[in-house]
Structure formats: structure tokens, C-alpha cells
A protein has these predicted regions:
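Aromatic-anchored segments of alpha-helical transmembrane domains
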Residues: 47-57, 111-123, 171-182
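Alpha-helical transmembrane segments in multipass membrane proteins, preferentially the mid-helix core
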Residues: 21-26, 88-91, 143-161, 175
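Membrane-embedded alpha-helical segments of multi-pass membrane proteins
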Residues: 12-20, 78-88, 108, 138-146
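Non-cytosolic membrane-interface motifs at loop->transmembrane helix junctions
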Residues: 65-78, 128-139
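Juxtamembrane "helix-exit" motif on the non-cytosolic side of transmembrane helices
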Residues: 56-66, 120-129
């Protein structure tokens, strides 16, 4: 297929699909049992993992002299912000009830939801010549959106500042791990003869941050300041998502109450 363009038929169809699935999940399973939510989290996680494995193989296989050669592109290693559901969904699916799981739910309903929305609004960088990759990215980021929206409705009582701080702790931990990977590979790859690099979470101290707005901050301030702005900025965005979702949920409950009273 030709490389999709922002807001062409391919993109618009997937926007419609994600909106439809979001509405379906909220209407059908808003009050589902915790056991059912765990099953859904496990299923969505499995789907995302399978497509991610396929994606990684496609990025690792190249054609040289009419034969397939494995030459993995470490830049695409699955530890970006949008890869976080691969590591957080199992917590929602399998962890015991408690603060840690509540924070994971809050993370998926705020941070991860925001990341998915960003890709769907500005998808230019994720579309490419591989048809399967284009479907994978729409499925992956679409799942971030519709399951994030669903979790916000299902666990609406957990949408609070306390759990947002817990979600921020998860995000910060992932960012620190990403930074360690960036630093270690920067020094290890040349010694190992690997002609590639990592910029996980786009916070490498050695390579520019390509994200909108943050790319300007990266070049304008010392790196430690950039890192603080990065984490605090995404926390603010996640908080905004939380407030928007709380408003939508409140409006939905109000409308449902009016419909019930009119019957």
C-alpha cells in the first residue's frame, strides 16, 4: 500500500474504529467485574505483544545480495513511551489488588492514553512503506486509547491526584530505565561493533529529542533541566487527561440520570 498520510482514508477509518470500540467497551462493560477486566487486559496485552514481535522481526530482517540477513535496528527496540503498555498491562491483568495495581490502572488511563492520542492526532512519523507496520501501529496506539478510556470509566473512583502521583512514579521509573539503556548502549555499542544507537523515551543525553516542543527545550536548556521538564510536562498532560476524563464521565452519568428520570 502507499504510505498513509495524516487524515487520509486509512487514518480516518482507524479513528472511527477506535472511537467505536471505546464507546462499545464503555457502554457494554462499564461495570464489568474485576475478573473480566483482568481478562480483557490479558487479551489486549497478548495482541499487542504478537504484533510487536512481528514488527521487531520486520525491522531486523534486511535483504542483501538476494538473501535475507538479520541486522537489527536498535533504534526501534520496544522501550519507548508508547511501548509502556507492553510492560504495564500485565500488572493490571495479573497483579494482586492494591496500590501498585491502582497506580498501573491510573497510568494506562492517563499517561498511556495521552501517548496514544498524540500518535493518532500527529501520525506522520509512524506511517511507513510496510503495510503490516501501519496496521500494527494503529492497533497498538488505538488499544492505548480505547482501553485507556475504558479503564477511566470502569475505575472512575480511582481517577484522583493520589493515583496520578503513583502513575507518575511509574512513568519516572520507566524514564530512568530508558535513560540507563541510552547511556549504557552509547558506550557499549562501539566496543561491541554495533553501528547503531538507542534513544529510548527520546531522552538520550547524546541525541536530540525529536518530540514537538520538547525538541526546543532540549536545545535551549541544560540536560538535567530538560529531563525535569520532560517528566513534569508529561505529568501535567496526564493530569489534564484525568480532568477531561472525569468531566466526560460526570457528564455521561448526568445524562444517564436524566434519561432514567424521564422513563
Amino acid at each position: 500500500m502507499p504510505i498513509p498520510q495524516p487524515y487520509d482514508w486509512f487514518h480516518l477509518v482507524w479513528i472511527g474504529i477506535v472511537i467505536a470500540i471505546s464507546i462499545f467497551l464503555v457502554c457494554k462493560f462499564k461495570n464489568a467485574s474485576d475478573s473480566d477486566v483482568r481478562k480483557m487486559a490479558g487479551i489486549f496485552w497478548g495482541v499487542m505483544v504478537v504484533f510487536e514481535i512481528i514488527k521487531q522481526f520486520l525491522f531486523g530482517i534486511v535483504v542483501e545480495e538476494d538473501r535475507l540477513v538479520w541486522d537489527y535496528m536498535w533504534y526501534f527496540f520496544p522501550f519507548q513511551f508508547c511501548s509502556s503498555p507492553l510492560y504495564i498491562l500485565p500488572i493490571v491483568a495479573f497483579a494482586k489488588d492494591g496500590k501498585f495495581r491502582d497506580n498501573a490502572i491510573s497510568f494506562l488511563a492517563t499517561f498511556s492514553l495521552f501517548a496514544g492520542i498524540c500518535v493518532y492526532v500527529l501520525p506522520s512519523d509512524v506511517f511507513m512503506q510496510f503495510t503490516l507496520i501501519n496496521y500494527q501501529t494503529m492497533i497498538h496506539h488505538g488499544t492505548q486509547i480505547f482501553f485507556g478510556v475504558y479503564l477511566a470509566f470502569r475505575y472512575r473512583e480511582k481517577l484522583n491526584f493520589k493515583n496520578l502521583l503513583g502513575a507518575t512514579a511509574i512513568f519516572s521509573t520507566l524514564a530512568v530505565l530508558a535513560l540507563l539503556m541510552n547511556v549504557l548502549t552509547y558506550h557499549l555499542f562501539p566496543a561491541l561493533g554495533v553501528n547503531d544507537y538507542m534513544n529510548m523515551f527520546f531522552i538520550s543525553p547524546y541525541y536530540d529529542c525529536p518530540l514537538p516542543l520538547l525538541s526546543v527545550v532540549y536545545k535551549a536548556v541544560p540536560y538535567p533541566v530538560f529531563l525535569c521538564v520532560y517528566i513534569f510536562g508529561f505529568m501535567l498532560c496526564a493530569g489534564l487527561i484525568m480532568l477531561i476524563m472525569k468531566g466526560i464521565i460526570k457528564l455521561s452519568e448526568k445524562n444517564n440520570g436524566q434519561i432514567t428520570n424521564n422513563k
